From Swiss-Prot:
Catalytic activity: a ribonucleoside 5'-triphosphate + H2O = a ribonucleoside 5'-phosphate + diphosphate + H(+); a 2'-deoxyribonucleoside 5'-triphosphate + H2O = a 2'-deoxyribonucleoside 5'-phosphate + diphosphate + H(+)
Chief localization: cytoplasm
Protein keywords: Cytoplasm, Hydrolase, Nucleotide metabolism
Statement: the UniProt record of this protein carries the keyword Ribonucleoprotein: no
Family: Belongs to the Maf family.
EC number(s) reported in the record: 3.6.1.9
InterPro entries: ITPase-like_fam (IPR029001), Maf-like (IPR003697)
Designated name of the protein: Nucleoside triphosphate pyrophosphatase
Location of this chain's protein in the cell: Cytoplasm
Amino acid sequence: MELILGSQSSARANLLKEHGIKFEQKALYFDEESLKTTDPREFVYLACKGKLEKAKKLLTNHCVIVVADSVVSVDNRMQRKAKNKQEALEFLKRQNGNEIEVLTCSALISPVLEWLDLSVFRARLKAFDSSEIEKYLESGLWQESAGCVRLEDFHRPYIKSSSKNLSVGLGLNVEGLLGALKLGAKLSLL
């Protein structure tokens, strides 16, 4: 059965590759600006549900579609993708030396199964090096990530402690997804 990743995220694609999951990547457009909530948990859930509804239109008998959405929460204040360098700097200042939460809602739909999961990755951060912040902002890498959080590079050396579910922090609950894929395979045999 073909797996489609309904996301343009390179981090999500890399997670699937690292776990040996073959997939095709397709962009699904969902207007997140239409969501009026500022509650991080509600927002990420509704965004993922919206993407899941779009995915249903692509669903055939021979495919599984995976979608996800992530936001960052600092003191219960939501951080999405920064619109510009100034907003990126504000996000990083709020994160500096604090605990951050990456909330990821992952979902899968197949002809036999619909699975949705909302998980949280928590990390306590050390203070950022101001010269490294400047380099990071100049690199433009922050533009790809909710809250400008890149656990795979910029944020990694600043993590004092964290929860163990790193894939959630990177944008997809791979462990949960693997379980859903196994269950879906069993159900399709019935």
